[in-house]
Design a protein with these regions (language model features):
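Soluble FAD-dependent oxygen oxidases
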Residues: 1-528
């Protein structure tokens, strides 16, 4: 009987995508490093493996990168413990092949699972252990766990603890924290990375390091600097935050015909300065008019969470934001986990078990961009934006208010620098459902034009952007002799003055630039 290891080796060697013996050499190395040849056969998927396509697709969250022409990995490695991660790093480095690190697969540009050179995907989705310690008010969370799984495990142990992460439950913890994730408690508690207590990372030499052994600089860098530039984060230890027994949510829609412009103008002054327990996200979308057949208008939708009861919220908004006209019938009181579900699916009948569903192999075609607003946009400016949005057709905007805790934390505390001085962040958003080059080109052109139109209203020198809303239009690192100069272009936008420190950390811990992607942190130029 042929051993499983040899069967897989034969499979890989016969792969049409195999480049020489690189993939076979990798498998031999992995078997040797783990000393578990039978186990290795269950971890590695060659292109000839019947399950290869389903494993690849499971965590592709942008359908733009799920096409026949999208570059495919030579192999997919799906480790189940940290020693297998070590082995994958060592073996990929030994044979000189690029390693892509994927947790939830939500990178907007597919950077975690595509490349223009031969590559291997290190799929972290099986590393999903979550250990919650309510006495310590902390949790160790593996990088392949999802936010939904994390929230569920916290809720299992306590109804008065939570974590200030994002509102999309299928997002992977590794990428979310690695890029400085945020959620609807950021005005009260700041970013996810403001609550990281420790971490375990595999470095470029295949060593496992924790906070003490990695040192202050690397620990700083992996909390929002794009952790995949520095190593493979296996797990983060996070601090939980207190949440009240009652949380209040609401969703209110207004159209231009209902004084939406006045409401948006006032929102800019209120949302970043009001009680830090209140987070009011605003969606701005071009839609068909309800009153004028065949015409387009703008609809705004305010989606909010208040860490308190309904009476407190209505009293607060009637005083600070009467233009909104919030009424008792607009609000819902829930516990914290109920608010998580409401934000995720807007369904009052869903149980928390839904958070454990990863919904694999589901993806829209999407394009995203980001900006920061530091001065309120005038009413004339808003009307200019509405006009352009209606002309373009489909691209929407999402306004996320800052202030509160975000203004109290120094810009240098973590690599994420966008703190005091920012009123709100803009996410540009366009989704579509059908494949095709012309559709992709059309919507890409739309979102780029809208981004250009907003230039006068957003931050300057640099025009800042958010790493976790990845956008290759703002710069790409081609990993050649100009790597540092190319990195400065997007690095200044994502990290502002923190970019230089990130480069120094990168040069110290990964001088050979093994961990790299289209927007990774470069090393310092080598002296002649």
């Amino acid at each position: 009987m042929i051993p499983l290891f040899l069967l897989l080796l034969l499979q890989i060697s016969a792969s049409p995508a195999a480049s020489g013996s690189v993939d076979a050499t990798f498998l031999q190395c992995l078997s040797k490093q783990t000393n578990q040849p039978a186990q290795v056969s269950k971890l590695v998927y060659a292109q000839s493996n019947p399950s290869y396509s389903s494993v690849l697709r499971a965590y592709i969250r942008n359908a733009r990168f799920n096409t026949s022409s999208t570059p495919k990995p030579v192999l997919i490695v799906t480790p189940t413990d940290e020693t297998q991660v070590q082995a994958a790093v060592i073996c990929a480095k030994n044979i000189g092949i690029q390693l892509k690190i994927r947790s939830g697969g939500h990178d907007y540009e597919g950077v975690s699972y595509i490349s223009d050179v031969p590559f291997i995907i290190l799929d972290m989705s099986n590393l999903r252990t979550i250990n919650v310690n309510i006495q310590e008010q902390s949790a160790w969370v593996s990088a392949g766990a999802t936010l939904g799984e994390l929230y569920y495990r916290i809720w299992e142990k306590s109804k008065v603890h939570g974590f200030p992460g994002g509102v999309c439950p299928t997002v992977g913890v590794g990428g979310h924290l690695g890029g400085g994730g945020y959620g609807n408690m950021l005005r009260k508690h700041g970013l996810t990375v403001d609550h990281v207590l420790d971490a375990k990372i595999v470095d470029a030499n295949g060593k496992i390091l924790d906070k003490n052994s990695m040192g202050e600089d690397l620990f700083w860098a992996i909390r929002g600097g794009g952790a995949a530039s520095f190593g493979v984060v296996i797990a983060y230890k996070i601090a939980l935050v207190p949440v009240p027994e009652k949380v209040t949510v609401f969703r209110v829609e207004k159209y231009l015909e209902e004084n939406a412009t006045d409401i948006v103008y006032k929102w800019q002054h209120v949302a970043p300065t009001i009680d830090e327990n209140l987070f009011m996200r605003m969606l701005v979308q071009p839609v068909s008019s309800k009153t004028k057949k065949g015409e387009k208008t703008i609809r705004i939708t305010i989606i909010a969470q208040f860490l308190g009861n309904a009476d407190e919220l209505i009293t607060l908004l009637n005083k600070e934001f009467p233009e909104l006209g919030l009424k008792n019938g607009d609000v819902l009181e829930k516990d914290w986990i109920g608010s998580v579900l409401w934000w995720g699916i807007k369904d009052n009948n869903t149980t928390p078990n839904w958070l454990l569903d990863r919904h694999p192999d589901t993806a829209d075609f999407t394009r995203r961009k980001s900006d920061y607003v530091q001065q309120p946009i005038s009413k004339d400016g808003l009307e200019f934006i509405w006009k352009r949005m209606i002309e373009l057709g489909k691209t929407g905007l999402v306004f996320n208010p800052y202030g509160g805790k975000m203004s109290q934390i120094p810009a240098s505390a973590t690599p994420f620098p966008h703190r005091a001085g920012n009123l709100f962040k803009i996410q540009y958003s366009v989704n579509w459902e059908e494949p095709g080059y012309e559709l992709d080109k059309n919507y890409t052109t739309q979102i780029r034009k809208l981004h250009d139109y907003l230039t006068p209203f957003v931050s300057k020198n640099p025009r800042s952007a958010y790493l976790n809303y990845r956008d290759l239009d703002i710069g790409v690192n081609h990993q050649g002799k100009n790597s540092y100069a190319e990195g400065q272009v997007f690095g200044a936008k994502y990290f502002n003055a923190n970019f230089d420190r990130l480069v120094k950390v990168k040069t110290a811990v990964d001088p050979d630039n093994f961990f790299r992607n289209q927007q990774s942190i470069p090393t310092l130029p080598k002296k002649a």
